[in-house]
Structures are given as structure tokens and as C-alpha cells.
A protein has these predicted regions:
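Glycine-rich, acidic/polar active-site loops that bind/position phosphate-bearing ligands
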Residues: 1-357
Length: 357
């Protein structure tokens, strides 16, 4: 048992929006667990699409550290990092946290966010969704009403991965607030939040990392593709719930409607950062709105933005933006939503909410 060592798993986002990681071992007597004292590191950016071979060093700057739930025998942390070029001042390709961080720092609206991450578990050996027998499985596996929040081995595939993910996210201290089986066999969802803007994005990336590491153990991989199958099969989204303090306050419904109208004006700008291949998902079918149209409604899962029924009844709360695809970079989505709403409001109160669906 190496109690005199500390293991740091450095995690970053590459040029294609995929996760990378590597670890280093430090002496415990020289380690300070304050984040500001976590050492910077470098990696070969030419091997991740973030640099060329002539100036290939990319700097890793730690920005969030949580307990590493995979290592029990000594002190260890998962260390989320931003990537920088050269002297450490220029954000590297795909460092979208940099702009999100600047906007969140001046957040006068006290935004809270929650993100519902859908995904499909695939078997690495067959290339098919987990426990599917062959690629010509009847369309029943995609269109039946049996799979959403299902129970039972004949229709629920991969629960051991989902429950292990929940457990390890809790051990890491992440704000994971639920899981459920989704509308297609082997499709699942977990939720992160409610958190402030930067935190919800950091935690979603860390939760994705933990999920993908668990999948490795079972010869599986995780797909966040918005439409992993044909046009008639369900897609995977990252429904993004959010509110400002005014939306959460008395008669917040007025500000909720105002927010819906502001999002109408920025629909195209939002869609541009709501995930690659998302046009395959936003077809107006399978509980989605058409990508070329904007709509909102109470309890309407075919709308671009849904006002939950209990929010309308309470006249305050939050919105659910149903447009983001499962493969989003959350920093881009959160930034787009905040920019859409932060144009002429100057708030100075606060309240809270603690649930969303």
C-alpha cells in the first residue's frame, strides 16, 4: 500500500472533442492538495490534433480536481485541465472553457444549470448496442414504449454499468442527481446539476470520463452520437435545464416567457454549437422539434424549449432547452444560453430550485 504517493490523473479535451488522460505519481510529502498548487504539465499536441510536430508541447493547467474513485490504495485525484499553447496564455484548439469562464465570472443573473446526458452503450466486439443479438434486430428495439425507465432483464440492458457510474460519480463528489433507462434498448441517461455555469460543464466532462472508463472494463464503449442509427430510430440528446434568479422568484413565469422569446432570436446561433450531426436528430420526430423551426410550450416534448408543467403551475422555476445533442461541448452550450439571455437585464436577488426532469 503506497500511502506515501499521490496519483494525479490529468484529463483534457482534444481537438475532436474527445477525452484524453495520463497520470503522474508525486511524493505525498511534497504534494499540496489546494488546486492552485497542482503542478502544470504538458503533452504532445501533435498526437491530439492540437499542435504541429515542430512546436508540439501543449500546457495542461489544472482547473478542477475531484477524488479519483478508481484508486483506493492511495491518495488520488481526477484533474480536469484546460489546454494552452506556448507561454500558457493562448488557449489551445477546443479550449472552450476559456470563454465560458470569462462569462460566468461576470454572471449577474445567478444562472443555475442542469444537463441530462443521454448515451448508448455499445459492445466493443460486435459493434452493436449492448446485448443486441444482431444488427437486424426488429425495429421494436427502437420504437417500443417498453424501454423508457424499464425494469427486467428482457428489456433493460447495461444497468450494472449505470449503477457503477452513479456510485463512482458520488464517490468523486460530483453533483449527479439521477439516472434512468431511455427510450431505446441499451440507451441510458444521467443528470448533472443544478450547478453554476462553469461547474456544471466541468462535472459533465468528469462524469463522461468516469462512464467511459467503466465501459472499458466490460469491453464496451459509449456513444454520444446524436443519431447512432437511422432516421426512424431515437436519437440521444443533452437537454439543458437552466434558470436565472428572477425565473426562480415570485412570478418568475414572466421572465421564463421572456427567456423563451430571447432564445427564439438566437435560435440559429445556438444550433450552431448544439452538437455535430444534430440535424440528423432534430427532425420533428421522436420527441424533437425541427432544426429549422423554433417553438416552446408547456409540457411539450416536441418543442425546442419545454416549460415543465409543474413550473407553469408554480409560476416560477426553470426551462428545458431540448435542442442540444448528446455530443455537445457543454461550455459552448452554456455560453450560448447565457449570451442569449444576458443582453439587457441587471438582476440583484437570489432564490433556489432543486429539481428538474
Amino acid at each position: 500500500m503506497e500511502k506515501n504517493k499521490v496519483i494525479l490523473e490529468y484529463i483534457w479535451i482534444d481537438a475532436d472533442g474527445e477525452l484524453r488522460s495520463k497520470n503522474r505519481v508525486l511524493s505525498a510529502d511534497k504534494f499540496d492538495s489546494l488546486l492552485d498548487n497542482f503542478p502544470e504539465w504538458t503533452f504532445d499536441g501533435s498526437s491530439t490534433g492540437q499542435a504541429n510536430g515542430f512546436v508540439s508541447d501543449i500546457i495542461l493547467k489544472p482547473v478542477r480536481a475531484v477524488t479519483n474513485p478508481f484508486i483506493k490504495y492511495t491518495e488520488s485525484y481526477l484533474v480536469l485541465c484546460e489546454c494552452y499553447e506556448k507561454c500558457g496564455k493562448i488557449p489551445a484548439k477546443n479550449n472552450n472553457r476559456f470563454d465560458c469562464d470569462k462569462l460566468a465570472f461576470v454572471d449577474k443573473d445567478d444562472f443555475l444549470f442542469g444537463i441530462e446526458q443521454e448515451y448508448v452503450i455499445f459492445d466493443r466486439l460486435t459493434g452493436l448496442p449492448y446485448k443486441w443479438e444482431n444488427e437486424s434486430m426488429p425495429s421494436y428495439y427502437a420504437s417500443s414504449n417498453e424501454f423508457y425507465c424499464s425494469v427486467g432483464g428482457q428489456r433493460t440492458f447495461g444497468r450494472h454499468i449505470v449503477e457503477e457510474h452513479l456510485q463512482l460519480c458520488l464517490e468523486a463528489g460530483l453533483t449527479i442527481c439521477g439516472t434512468n433507462a431511455e427510450v431505446m434498448a441499451s440507451q441510458w441517461e444521467f443528470q448533472i446539476g443544478p450547478c453554476h455555469p462553469r461547474a456544471v460543464c466541468d462535472e459533465l466532462w468528469l462524469a463522461r470520463y468516469i462512464l467511459q472508463r467503466i465501459a472499458e472494463k466490460y469491453n464496451c464503449f459509449i456513444s454520444f452520437h446524436p443519431k447512432p442509427f437511422g432516421p426512424d430510430w431515437p436519437g440521444s440528446g443533452a437537454h439543458t435545464n437552466f434558470s436565472t434568479w428572477q425565473m426562480r422568484g415570485q412570478d418568475g413565469i414572466l421572465y421564463i416567457i421572456e427567456a423563451c422569446e430571447k432564445l427564439r432570436k438566437t435560435h440559429n446561433d445556438c444550433i450552431a454549437v448544439y452538437g455535430k450531426y444534430n440535424e440528423q436528430r432534430l427532425t420533428g420526430k421522436n420527441e424533437t422539434a425541427n432544426i429549422n423551426e423554433y417553438s416552446y410550450g408547456i409540457g411539450d416534448r416536441n418543442a425546442s424549449v419545454r416549460i415543465p408543467l409543474h413550473v407553469a403551475n408554480n409560476r416560477c422555476g426553470y426551462l428545458e432547452d431540448r435542442r442540444p445533442g448528446a455530443n455537445i461541448d457543454p461550455y459552448l452550450v452554456v455560453t450560448a444560453i447565457m449570451k442569449s439571455l444576458q443582453n439587457n437585464n441587471d438582476y440583484d436577488d437570489e432564490s433556489g430550485y432543486d429539481s428538474y426532469s
